[in-house]
């Protein structure tokens, strides 16, 4: 039996918002890392930024579900890598447009319109695939990681997310320290480059506060560019999340 896997060239994949103002460019760089950038009306909003995940390394003192010894540390290091070594296997685009009515809120009807790009990435060194799905709306970009059912990626724990958002400028940011337990902080307004130096004084002596990083901030993070564009970074579709 022969296994035949074909790949499309690692050329740039472009996606445009329905109104044409936002343009996403995706490609796999020379290290095999998924990379994207975003422009708005021809101006760079997000510079080339890499995507990926790091998995928790398996315990090398145990056997796997097939009772195979897992003492090859090099292989275990490789299996924790979901951030480079990829090839672009396929790219699919779709469009979607619907109007729905919320139960309450300021709008009677909300239009859900976007163009979508799904990139299927194959990692030869671990014989596994992931999907990165982008949705580009007239007012923003969303993306998520998907894990097709496969033997080589059956059970795993995500240790770190390595999604990058490389801002195109030293924007004004409206931020609070990143915290596991609370949102009860006063907002600080500063340039992005000043966050590290201001973090200590942004944390108040409060037993409910548990900052997770000396530099990390909480989402939603709102920013304002020098030419008046507002940018907001946040999470979406937290389905079944323990909050």
Positions of predicted regions on the chain:
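Bacterial Sec-dependent N-terminal signal peptides
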Residues: 1-13
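N-terminal accessory beta-strand-rich subdomains and adjacent acidic, glycine-rich linkers
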Residues: 14-243
């Amino acid at each position: 039996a022969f296994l035949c896997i074909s790949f499309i060239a690692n050329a740039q994949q472009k996606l445009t918002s329905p109104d044409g103002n936002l343009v996403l460019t995706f490609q796999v760089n020379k290290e095999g890392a998924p990379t994207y950038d975003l422009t708005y009306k021809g101006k760079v909003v997000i510079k080339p930024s890499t995507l990926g995940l790091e998995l928790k390394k398996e315990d090398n003192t145990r056997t796997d579900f097939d009772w195979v010894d897992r003492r090859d540390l090099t292989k275990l290091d490789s299996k924790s890598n979901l951030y480079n070594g990829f090839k672009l296997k396929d790219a699919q685009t779709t469009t979607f447009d619907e109007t729905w009515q919320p139960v309450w809120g300021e709008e009677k009807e909300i239009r859900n319109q976007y163009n979508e790009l799904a990139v299927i990435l194959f990692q030869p060194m671990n014989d596994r695939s992931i999907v990165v799905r982008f949705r580009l709306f007239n007012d923003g970009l969303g993306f998520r990681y998907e894990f097709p059912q496969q033997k080589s990626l059956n059970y795993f724990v995500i240790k770190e997310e390595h999604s990058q958002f490389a801002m195109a400028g030293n924007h004004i940011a409206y931020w609070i320290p990143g915290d596991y337990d609370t949102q009860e902080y006063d907002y600080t307004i500063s340039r992005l480059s000043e966050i590290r130096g201001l973090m200590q004084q942004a944390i108040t002596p409060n037993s409910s506060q548990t900052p997770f990083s000396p530099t990390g901030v909480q989402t939603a993070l709102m920013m304002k560019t020098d030419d008046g564009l507002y940018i907001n970074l946040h999470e979406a579709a937290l389905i079944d999340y323990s909050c």
